[in-house]
Regions:
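S-adenosyl-L-methionine
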Residues: 1-113, 117-183, ...
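Short internal loop-to-helix segment that lines adenine-nucleotide cofactor pockets
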Residues: 55-84, 132, 161-220, 231-235
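Conserved acidic-Pro-Pro-aromatic motif
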Residues: 81, 101-108, 184-283
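Short, glycine/acidic-enriched loop or turn micro-motifs at the edges of active sites
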Residues: 88-90, 113, 140, 202-204, ...
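Short N-terminal helix/helix-N-cap motif within the alpha/beta-hydrolase-1
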Residues: 92-95, 117, 143, 207-211
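Short, glycine/charged-enriched secondary-structure capping and boundary segments
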Residues: 97-101, 121-124, 147-150, 162, ...
Length: 283
């Protein structure tokens, strides 16, 4: 192990060791409720989610702030819309939304059974009656599909699409291939369940998720915060632009550039007026 890498990215280096893989299966990594600075405790696995515990207030700070401002703006306007968390993982953004706006309804979509266990425990323990957990992947069709489960960090599980999973590419650890259910977001967009804000973090499956959300996006024009990397990024931008969305780099709040991988997208006819969007971007 390189000493420079150990000191510059210690957790990344430690995760590559056999000892860490052993400890993940030990009682040190049993599910527990932790205080992450929200209004209620959150279920995590201490070692699997070590980066969340150690870097919680510094984890995706620009995206977190943008998301929080958008959620609060929707709440202030008393917008009758929900938050759809697509690729919820252990629930970080769902819990931020619930902590900031307890009356807002949330649907958390997550296919990984180990993450689903955490989501359900948090909801049950804290009696989060506004949160609905849907144990499925979102895509552009119905049925079962193969899913690379990331048992090391739980954060980079992905639909099998021929690409090398992150945990294998960067940490040298094998993912576990499991079968999960998939469906389309349009199936959950009903008169009783209309999203005002959608967060999408699905490790390369964004084009398919958006295709399966096309009717909802056309009809209701929710605000979108999503992660995407080349070459999928161009597909995502083209798809949203054709629907009339405005798009900025979510981290920099500037036009898209060479380093863009997080998008903030809104429609001029969406749930918030342009003045509120500008206020969010200038905050």
């Amino acid at each position: 192990m390189s000493l420079s890498l150990l000191f510059n990215a210690p957790l990344h280096s430690i995760r590559k060791t056999r000892l860490y893989a052993f400890l993940l299966k030990s009682r040190l990594n049993r599910v527990r409720l932790s205080n992450l600075g929200l209004s209620f405790p959150v279920a995590i696995r201490p070692l699997t989610h070590a980066s969340i515990r150690w870097r919680n207030n510094r984890l995706e700070p620009e995206i977190t702030e943008l998301f929080t401002q958008a959620i609060k703006a929707l709440d202030r306007k008393d917008i009758d819309g929900q938050f759809f968390d697509v690729g919820a993982n252990h629930g970080r953004y769902a819990w931020i939304a619930q902590s900031a706006c307890p009356d807002m309804k949330v649907i958390a979509f997550e296919p990984d059974p180990e993450n689903i266990e955490l989501l359900e425990l948090t909801v049950e323990h804290s009696k989060l009656e506004q949160v609905r957990i849907v144990a499925t992947a979102l895509s552009d069709e119905e049925g079962m599909i193969s899913f690379h489960q990331d048992k090391l960090t739980s954060a980079t599980g992905m639909i099998q699409d021929g690409e090398t999973p992150w945990v294998e590419k960067y940490l040298g650890q094998k993912s576990r291939l499991i079968e999960v259910r998939r469906t389309m977001l349009d199936s959950y967009c009903t008169p009783e369940s209309i999203p005002a804000l959608i967060k999408i973090d699905v490790e390369g499956h964004e084009p398919e998720v958006l295709q399966g959300s096309a009717q909802c996006l056309q009809d209701h024009k929710p605000i979108l915060i999503l992660e995407s990397f080349p070459p999928k990024l161009e597909q995502v931008v083209n798809f949203l632009t054709e629907l009339g969305y405005e798009i900025l780099d979510a981290e920099r709040k500037k036009p898209l550039g060479a380093h863009t991988n997080n998008l903030f997208a809104w429609h001029p006819e969406g749930p918030l007026p342009e003045s509120d969007i500008r206020e969010i971007l200038e905050s």
